[in-house]
Amino acid sequence: MRAVFGGQHGEREMQSEIAVKLSENVPRYTSYPTAPHFHSGVDAAIYRGWLEALESGDEISLYLHIPYCDKLCWFCACHTKQTHQYEPVAAYLRSLNAEIVTIAGLVSGKAHVRAIHFGGGSPTMLRPNDMVALGAALRDSFDLLPDATVSIEIGTNDMDKARLDALAQIGVTRASLGVQDFDPQVQKAINREQSFLQTKAVVDGVRSRGVESVNLDLLYGLPNQTRETICSTVAQALTLEPDRMALFGYAHVPWFKKHQTMIDEAWLPSPTERFAQSQLAARAIVAKGYEAIGLDHFAKPDDALAIAARAGVLHRNFQGYTEDRCPTLIGLGPSSIGRFRQGYVQNMASTAGYGRMVADGGLAAVRGVALSDDDRVRGWIIERLMCDFAFSAVDLVERFGKAGEKLLHRSRSIALHDPARALEFDGDSFVVRAESRPFVRTIAAKFDTYFKGGTARHSVAV
């Protein structure tokens, strides 16, 4: 997205034409192979072997999933459920602690934790004492590096002084707040009411307690959303001076998330309008000095994400773009996905089923994929396209040898026969043309041997 901010009328027309050609339903490529292609052949026994194969000195990241919210937002595509009672949450925490003990027993003394991320659902719906206890359990069970980062997704409507204090106690270094859109009509249409003043109070609250980095998530393509509302939201969000911002396109997938049927599709903007919203919002963010990162992130120039992007070491995982270089990510909680050198593994999605599996020292893995040599090469190409909009032919061959040479020929064929001329080869590198960068997911899909257009349902490319 970073190279499409010119204001020329002709350029906008060209981008709109490309949008019509390339706005297909394609994966988001937060992994490769993507989650729909995970299978039951990777189970708890294989997962245990991958954990035991970690070596002394390995650095790992942890992701903890809290699959509950006290109010369900209709736009949400996350694995979560609404509850007005706390007992299911308390019971779930007992299961989560059991999994923590089991995993720690397999990796402690070998692996060091570089990063922890709390996601959901809404992690901040936990009672403050439970939040502190969970943080303590992680520190007691795993070997955390002194400079380990701790990030959390915040539900603004959950927050009070006690919860803000709890974040400080567990050592949160980065807080991410979902804003979506500040317009009341948009908020009503997505069942999420959250004022600018509420958001500002939470941002001020976490900063006053030592949180080093604040991220704000915005959405375009929402029901009742217009170019005016998204621009107004961006302007208000920028006054909070976040260190990072994400600008995601709303993924309308009611066949996957039934509660999205609460959104009247007649209220959704057209593909052309979605594209216009995304570009206007992105231009406004960059105009304030933020650097565009990959497809949909922005960061201040001195932020670790921007530094990683400039150095060519940006990565992509299930939370989006990251500077985290750990080759191993351990997912804790139902539906959580782990990444290992050997492949990907995913826990049971059912909270009740997950609880039964982790009882008495069990693991909850029920699906995943072991990586082939071809998967590794294609995954590297796709990640570099998603992160850098380019990849080096020399790097490809040096890293992967004959397997890289095979994909080099495929890459040249894609560049040569692409009617949209979205990918070009300059003799050294394959580069996504500037005006095609918003549609890089469509380009990445050309390297995906699992993806068959029309056979799997994904969100639109823009």
In which residue ranges do the predicted regions lie?
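C-terminal scaffold of the Radical SAM
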Residues: 52-59, 83-106, 112-402, 461
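Short, amphipathic alpha-helical interaction segments positioned at domain boundaries
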Residues: 437-462
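Flexible, acidic/Gly-rich N-terminal and inter-domain linker regions that tether
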Residues: 1-61
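Minor-groove-contacting beta-hairpin "wing" of winged helix-turn-helix DNA-binding domains
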Residues: 429-433
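A short, conserved structural fragment
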Residues: 418-428
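Short amphipathic alpha-helical interaction segments
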Residues: 403-416
